[in-house]
């Protein structure tokens, strides 16, 4: 097809006018049209939240295809795999529709080819592109195409540690070992080993991986801050800060004297206030830095007189207490800043004195890092295993050093498109530059939604182009998409009100002006006063907070407030739970949130990506078990195992065993004491009673058998042996959240198996890997389980990006920002390089022996201070963007939820606004989102803000006030008042009579088991008799049966029962890896993992199982593994017909496929049979029970049921 010319500016303008004058219900905006059709230059689309950027991107691609561009000529980068999939699906629909609409034969054929090529198009993440690229061109760098990705963090950590220790030993024993020893000691802290240094090395390495050339950055930028250090200018800056701080203090005190101080006319502190004002008043325009520093020193000294209470308003009058508290709080804030400035004077002096020494240390660090980076790179090349960043680095290296490859891609790509451009890092930016011809880039993003700095994303890449294109259109075209089609006017007005007053270039990195303000464009949503955004504050006093912290089970007031609003939406407005989202900045308080919601019976679905797998109790128990098997001399792990439900030793028993020390030993560990107790070889052997001795013997025997088994079997087999020997897997399944716990244990076995398949073998290395993951403060992802269909969504703000919900609650507004990065021993900056805290050894000059002659002083380098300030501004800017993302997720109504004392907050004072923004100090001193929102509410009271704040106290959060949806546990304890003992025997006898009457009336309910299995409830379904493996072929036909008089087989040969075959077959079907092609060889390998005897394995017909996957149902399962659930436990309430009491049914479903409006349930049976109808009749009731459980769980009525019959020579699939 011949290329059709792209539209000119005039043609685009005509198109915009025509769209504006059209009668369409939902019109494209002029900016959207411009973004879709503009061509011939670099284009940056700044697309605010809900402005339809995905629509614009898809329409632009479709327009190019319709003009004759091939889909293979477009490079389209998305932030996630999911986004790429969604874009491909959207394009598939649009191209198909265009084919149907057009009459142009050439266009039809062209678009048909594009549709066929769509699966192979360069649409995906940068990582997916670089993998394909390196697979094709890696030979240029001698990289084999069969490389693998180090996605397993634990494996990566093991490799990293091995390389670190190799490089460490080389430096520790090398020619520069003295200077290296100094570096080592600088990061040792209280420890005596290399862990402190190793932690900083890994941190720097992660940073280097985000640069386009790590070694180049190390050599050119790592020491830049030391090279350009200017202490004279720093002293001048500090003097300016001191001036400003003293003037702020003067303004505060004068305002206080002119207003509130009149209520405290004779208070003693006012004399000191006047004294300080006189000191500040002595300064003038001629005062130099020395004068300002002297006044600062005298002011700070005055504040410290009278044990620091010289300026404290100590009024005890109840009516004046709020005024006094507000003054004291602001005074503390002011003097905290003055104290910091005073400290900075001293620190700057030390920084200058030790600058050269710190520089030398940094050079040593630079050398070590360079050697480590190169050694680790070489090690990964030996393994032919790389991180994603390595793949990108090699891709850049090829594109830079092989012009013919670069030019071929530049000629191939008509346009280089990137979505979520604000989250691009420097590697990706360099790659995009190399793939582009310089004027064919299309970049879409929103700097206000850049929230991935922790992944080394740099919003300044976007911001630099935004500023450049805005000032000089010749550089590139800037298009602003501001119209929001997602949210109500109430949500948008509230968001604008917040960020117009909060975000600017100084704090926030951008000016939130008319270029960034959200514009309401969803004509389907009419204004509704009920949807006005609310800032809800749980009114807590100090005692209330203390009470809350006393017990984990007591619900926080903040969550009760949220639950009350959720129930109000659900019950009064008919809002479905799934329309409500709870957003948090982190998952640290998720346990409290989940507890509160469950107590009120509110279904909840989490984002499923908590990296706290190793913290789950059941996994911790198993890890301690493995530690003990590896080395029983570890007391902590041994006690954990003995106290666990697997063995159940209590504190009394452990105390008795801990006293079993041999008389001739000074110190013994617990395991040795257990051996002593077994041998009765201790002076305290009398403490070991018979029951304890038997319990101990059982424990020691089992532990010994596990240790022996571990020597000759895989980790996977060992873990399953532990589960089976002590029924631990079954035990955790009966606990609350049992399916998730079982999934965690199952995943532990799989992860152990994966570990041993990645060239690492043995229990010792597995435990070391886990300990290293924990030591590095990492964790593994938790295991996802099937969520409820209608449930409140609980997720982090990061996870919510790109999603939308009718009702959004932003929780924990009072949760402090995470500032761990600014407390590190090392802070890095792309501009300044390394900032480090230097440990100086200083002489004290002490003469007395009891005083130390030297002390160690931690001195942050000048670059460290500069980087710290840069990091603080970047962190606060990112927190603002995080709040923006959260607020713009709401479609109808937004709730911002926090807590605080109304009495204290109402009297809090803030500096006046400047240029319509909060004072920069107010913004930078905020500890959390709530501080910003409250300051805006107070400073801009007269502005009629589009959000209102409301305090909710304890009296409004009683059970009665909250609502009636709570579901009380049937085992809930009665109050002590109900259990009081009777005062008289007569009353006691009356109570006994009542109990007897009650027991008689409810005998059926008392005798009813509280938990039953499907086979136990045949009173409901008589045919339900789950007797897997029982032979029913020829049932009832004894005629003609040959009678045998052979002697029974009394040999010791292992006998195999049908039940054993059935159990093993089920486990095999559960273990089969459906992501790989199934062959007889792969099934044989999987069968080896099944926990059973070889005799049972020999009875399983693998050909038959392979044949099943060739059936219609088998093929459907293979094609829909993302919808497949296998071995799924379930529990369901049923009612006993006789007693009319509820009981729990528990069971395990062999498997089912879960679709949007349908479920396909299947169950394997290994029974022998003549006719399939025999098994259908037998198991019809059981499947009906499973059907009911699934229907109730997912609210889906359409359920197909199949029996997979494996009891004959050929497999049969029967629909029930």
Swiss-Prot record:
Gene3D superfamilies: 1.10.10.160, 3.90.320.10, P-loop containing nucleotide triphosphate hydrolases, PCRA, domain 4. Disulfide bonds: none annotated. Signal peptide: none annotated. Residues 515-802 form the UvrD-like helicase C-terminal domain. It catalyses: Couples ATP hydrolysis with the unwinding of duplex DNA by translocating in the 3'-5' direction; ATP + H2O = ADP + phosphate + H(+). The keyword DNA repair applies. ATP binds at residues 47-54. Residues 26-488 form the UvrD-like helicase ATP-binding domain. Pfam families: PDDEXK_1, UvrD-helicase, UvrD_C. One of its GO terms (biological process) is double-strand break repair via homologous recombination. Its cofactor is Mg(2+). Its EC number is 3.1.-.-, 5.6.2.4. InterPro entries: AddA, DExx_box_DNA_helicase_dom_sf, DNA_helicase_UvrD-like_C, DNA_helicase_UvrD/REP, P-loop_NTPase, PDDEXK-like_dom_sf, PDDEXK_AddAB-type, Restrct_endonuc-II-like. The keyword DNA-binding applies. GO terms for cellular component: cytosol; DNA helicase complex. Heterodimer of AddA and AddB/RexB. Belongs to the helicase family. AddA subfamily. The heterodimer acts as both an ATP-dependent DNA helicase and an ATP-dependent, dual-direction single-stranded exonuclease. Recognizes the chi site generating a DNA molecule suitable for the initiation of homologous recombination. The AddA nuclease domain is required for chi fragment generation; this subunit has the helicase and 3' -> 5' nuclease activities. This is ATP-dependent helicase/nuclease subunit A. It comes from Streptococcus pneumoniae (strain ATCC 700669 / Spain 23F-1).
């Amino acid at each position: 097809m011949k290329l059709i010319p792209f539209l000119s500016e005039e043609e685009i303008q005509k198109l915009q006018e025509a769209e504006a004058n059209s009668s369409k219900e939902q019109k494209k905006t002029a900016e959207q049209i411009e973004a879709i059709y503009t061509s011939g230059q670099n284009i940056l689309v700044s697309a605010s939240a809900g402005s339809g950027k995905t629509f614009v991107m898809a329409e632009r691609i479709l327009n190019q295809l319709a003009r004759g561009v091939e889909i293979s000529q477009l490079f389209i980068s998305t932030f996630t795999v999911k986004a790429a999939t969604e874009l491909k699906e959207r394009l598939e629909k649009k191209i198909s529709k265009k084919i149907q609409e057009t009459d142009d034969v050439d266009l039809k054929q062209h678009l048909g080819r594009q549709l066929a090529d769509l699966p192979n198009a360069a649409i995906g993440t940068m990582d997916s592109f670089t993998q394909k690229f390196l697979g094709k061109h890696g030979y240029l760098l001698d990289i084999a195409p069969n490389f693998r990705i180090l996605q397993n963090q634990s494996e990566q950590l093991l490799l990293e540690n091995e390389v670190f220790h190799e490089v460490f030993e080389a430096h520790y024993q090398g020619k520069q070992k003295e200077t290296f020893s100094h570096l080592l000691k600088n990061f040792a802290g209280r420890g005596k080993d290399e862990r402190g240094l190793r932690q900083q090395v890994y941190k720097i390495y992660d940073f280097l991986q985000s640069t386009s050339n790590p070694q180049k950055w190390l050599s050119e930028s790592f020491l830049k801050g030391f090279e350009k250090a200017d202490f004279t200018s720093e002293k001048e800056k500090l003097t300016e800060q001191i001036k400003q701080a003293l003037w702020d203090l003067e303004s505060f005190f004068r305002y206080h004297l002119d207003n509130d101080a009149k209520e405290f006319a004779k208070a003693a502190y006012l004399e000191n206030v006047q004294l300080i004002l006189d000191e500040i008043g002595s300064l003038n325009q001629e005062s130099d830095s020395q004068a300002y520093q002297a006044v600062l020193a005298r002011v700070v000294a005055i504040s410290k007189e009278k044990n620091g209470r010289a300026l404290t308003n100590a009024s005890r009058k109840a009516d004046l207490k709020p005024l006094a508290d507000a003054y004291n709080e602001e005074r503390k804030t002011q003097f905290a800043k003055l104290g910091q400035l005073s400290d900075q004077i001293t620190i700057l002096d030390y920084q200058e004195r030790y600058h050269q020494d710190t520089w030398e240390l940094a050079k040593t660090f630079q050398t070590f890092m360079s050697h480590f980076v190169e050694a680790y790179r070489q090690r990964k090349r030996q393994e032919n295993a790389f991180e994603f960043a390595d793949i990108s680095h090699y891709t850049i290296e090829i594109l830079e050093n092989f012009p013919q490859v670069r030019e071929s891609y530049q000629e191939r790509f008509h346009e280089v498109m990137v979505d979520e451009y604000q989250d691009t890092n420097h590697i990706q930016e360099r790659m995009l530059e190399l793939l582009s011809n310089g004027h064919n880039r299309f970049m879409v993003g929103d700097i206000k939604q850049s929230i991935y700095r922790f992944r080394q994303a740099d919003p300044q890449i976007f911001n630099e182009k935004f500023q450049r294109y805005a000032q000089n259109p010749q550089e590139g075209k800037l298009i602003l998409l501001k119209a929001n089609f997602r949210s109500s006017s109430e949500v948008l007005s509230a968001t604008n009100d917040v960020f117009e007053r909060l975000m600017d270039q100084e704090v926030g990195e951008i000016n939130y002006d008319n270029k960034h303000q959200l514009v309401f464009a969803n004509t389907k949503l009419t204004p509704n006063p009920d949807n006005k955004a609310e800032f809800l504050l749980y009114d807590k006093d100090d005692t209330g907070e203390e009470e809350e912290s006393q017990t984990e089970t007591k619900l926080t007031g903040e969550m009760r407030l949220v639950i009350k609003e959720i129930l109000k939406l659900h019950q009064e407005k008919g809002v479905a739970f799934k329309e409500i989202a709870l957003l948090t900045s982190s998952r640290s308080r998720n346990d409290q949130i989940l507890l509160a919601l469950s107590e009120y019976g509110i279904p909840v679905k989490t984002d499923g990506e908590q990296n706290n797998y190793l913290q789950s109790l059941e996994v911790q128990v198993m890890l301690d078990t493995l530690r003990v098997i590896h080395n029983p001399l570890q007391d902590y792990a041994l006690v954990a195992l003995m106290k666990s439900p697997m063995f159940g030793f209590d504190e009394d028993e452990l105390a008795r065993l801990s006293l079993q020390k041999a008389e001739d030993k000074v110190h013994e560990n617990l395991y040795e004491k257990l051996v002593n107790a077994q041998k009765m070889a201790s002076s305290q052997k009398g403490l070991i009673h018979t029951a304890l001795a038997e319990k101990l013997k059982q424990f020691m025997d089992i532990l010994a058998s596990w240790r022996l088994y571990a020597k000759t079997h895989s980790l996977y087999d060992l873990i399953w042996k532990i589960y089976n020997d002590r029924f631990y897997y079954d035990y955790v399944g009966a606990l609350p959240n049992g399916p998730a716990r079982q999934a965690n244990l199952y995943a532990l076995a799989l992860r152990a198996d994966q570990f041993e398949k990645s060239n690492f073998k043995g229990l010792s290395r597995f435990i070391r890997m886990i300990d290293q993951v924990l030591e590095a403060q990492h964790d593994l992802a938790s295991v996802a389980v099937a969520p409820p269909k209608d449930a409140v969504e609980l997720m982090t703000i990061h996870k919510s990006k790109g999603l939308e919900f009718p009702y959004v609650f932003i929780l924990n507004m009072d949760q402090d920002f995470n500032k761990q990065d600014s407390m590190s021993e090392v802070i890095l900056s792309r501009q300044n390089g390394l900032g480090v805290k230097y440990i100086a050894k200083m002489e004290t000059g002490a003469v007395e022996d009891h005083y130390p002659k030297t002390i160690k002083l931690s001195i942050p380098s000048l670059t460290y201070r500069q980087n710290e300030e840069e990091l603080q501004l970047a962190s606060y800017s990112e927190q603002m963007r995080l709040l923006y993302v959260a607020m713009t997720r709401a479609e109808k109504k937004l709730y911002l939820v926090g807590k605080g004392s109304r009495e204290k907050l109402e009297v809090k004072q803030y500096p006046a606004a400047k240029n319509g923004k909060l004072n920069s100090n107010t913004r930078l001193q905020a500890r959390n989102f709530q501080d910003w929102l409250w300051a805006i509410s107070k400073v801009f009271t007269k502005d009629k803000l589009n959000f209102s704040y409301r305090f909710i106290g304890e009296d409004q959060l009683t059970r009665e006030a909250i609502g009636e949806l709570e579901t009380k546990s049937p085992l809930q304890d009665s109050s002590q008042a109900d259990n009081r003992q009777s005062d008289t025997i007569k009353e006691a006898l009356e109570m006994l009579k009542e109990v007897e009457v009650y027991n008689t009336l409810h005998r059926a309910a008392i005798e009813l088991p509280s938990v039953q299995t499907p086979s136990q409830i045949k009173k409901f379904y008589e045919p339900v008799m789950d007797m897997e493996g029982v032979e029913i072929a020829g049932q009832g036909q004894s005629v003609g049966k040959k009678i045998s008089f052979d002697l029974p087989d009394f040999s010791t040969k292992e006998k195999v029962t049908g039940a054993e075959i059935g159990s093993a077959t089920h486990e095999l079907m559960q273990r089969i890896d459906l992501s790989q092609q199934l062959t007889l060889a792969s099934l044989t390998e999987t069968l080896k993992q099944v926990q059973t005897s070889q005799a049972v394995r020999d009875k399983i017909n693998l050909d038959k199982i392979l044949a099943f996957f060739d059936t219609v149902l088998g093929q459907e399962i293979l094609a829909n593994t993302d919808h497949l659930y296998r071995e799924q436990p379930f529990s369901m309430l049923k009612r006993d017909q006789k007693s009319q009491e509820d009981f729990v049914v528990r069971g395990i479903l062999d498997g089912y496929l879960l679709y949007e409006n349908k479920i396909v349930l299947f169950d394997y049976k290994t029974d022998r049979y003549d006719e399939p109808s025999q098994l259908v009749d037998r198991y019809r009731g059981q499947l009906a029970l499973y059907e009911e459980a699934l229907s109730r769980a997912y609210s889906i009525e359409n359920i197909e049921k199949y029996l997979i019959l494996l009891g004959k020579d050929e497999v049969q699939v029967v629909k029930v």
